Amino acid sequence: MAKGIVVYYSRSGNTKEMAEIIAKAMNDAGLSTECKPIDKVHADDLPAYDAVVIGSPCYYGQMAGPVKHLVDELVSRHGQLNGKVGAAFSSSANIGGGSETTVLGILEAMLIAGMVIQGDPQGAHYGPLSVGKPDERVRQQCERRGQRVAALTKRLFP
């Protein structure tokens, strides 16, 4: 049976809230999914999942240090995530604060790892982005991303 994980780093709670919404949507869509803060996850854990979703606040247009550390740890496990489904999301303090570049940085690492990334033709093309606390629009984008990740994962790993 396919399974997923949503991994996040959050200081203010905004990224955590987004992670919980995405994980719930994945579970509700029939993909058994765990939601864990990044300090409870090691790179060795990730190959056991068929879908890996990573969330980070935006710091200077980049992923937070703990998220970058996890991504860097994947180098020694190169190929172990090949063919798995990947997705990313981010929160920031300001409009234009760099959330898209944060998400793209995570997605770039996933692509190098051989992961399957699905864009979205509606709304959050690269992944859900929040400015501050997630509002209703962001909550809907998180739900949609979780549903789409679950659907793709179940198709690839029946």
What is the predicted function of each stretch?
Residues 2-4, 10, 14-158:
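FMN-binding flavodoxin-like domain, especially the glycine-rich phosphate-binding loop
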